[in-house]
Amino acid sequence: MNWQDGLAYAHAVCKGDINVCKAVQLTCQRFINQIENKEWEWQFDPDYPQHILDFAAALCHTKGPDAGKPIVLEPFQIFFICAIYGFRAKKDTSKRMVTDVILFIPRKAGKSTLTAIIALYELLCGEKGAEVFTLATNREQATIVFDAAKGFIENMPQELSGLFAVSKYEVKKIGDTQSMFKALSRDTKKTGDGKNPSCVIIDEAAQITDRNSIEVLHSGMVARANPLRIYITTASFTKETKFYEDMNLYKSMLNGEAADNPRWFGLLYGLDPQDDWRDIEIWKKAN
């Protein structure tokens, strides 16, 4: 897997070669504009996304007909990683530009696999004393990404799996006693109070009506040099949530209705308002 596949995806979307909604088109054009901008404080360094892609290539699928086969990410997933990890501060390339991320996409699109890779990478290669958490409304949902990550470790070659210490409810990085990767949920009353997260993956974020559980974890990230918060979700009938508030803000940035904040990145797959949902060809926009 190569970072250039992510760049190619963005260009293909902007050329109209891939049928996606307006929000994804605008995101891809924004990404290209950011790469071409030589006048601001950030620069695109492909070595950083390539590093996590190389890590992903060492992992194998753990379920279904592809079990045991190496992970091969889709172009949109490679683009997702490029956008998150590629932009670095010119004065200090260890500092990542993107800190807040949204992946809004239908089910069975590989978002749990993708974010499990990111979670393990952040635990292994992120800040010393990394604290990585998944958050959801219930324990079952919160453990989906966590269990996927544990499955990757169980199927790693020894030289890689030996870098992790795995227990039922926690994964640690060997040699870093302050590191941890855990699943949190509201129903078990295990939330982010007192935590100092470096990476948080909020699963089915659109379903979380208790905004405090999100805000507590977010406020705990302020001391981190490279915090990363990722919303992954499908749509929800409940719109009065912290997630929809943040997604609407990001949409406003894309549409030029709000000042652009480069610390935010999002891929929002879906249909456009004028689309006829009965047209099967249109479904490709959301999948």
Placement of each model-derived feature along the sequence:
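Phosphate/NTP-binding elements of NTP-utilizing enzymes
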Residues: 1-287
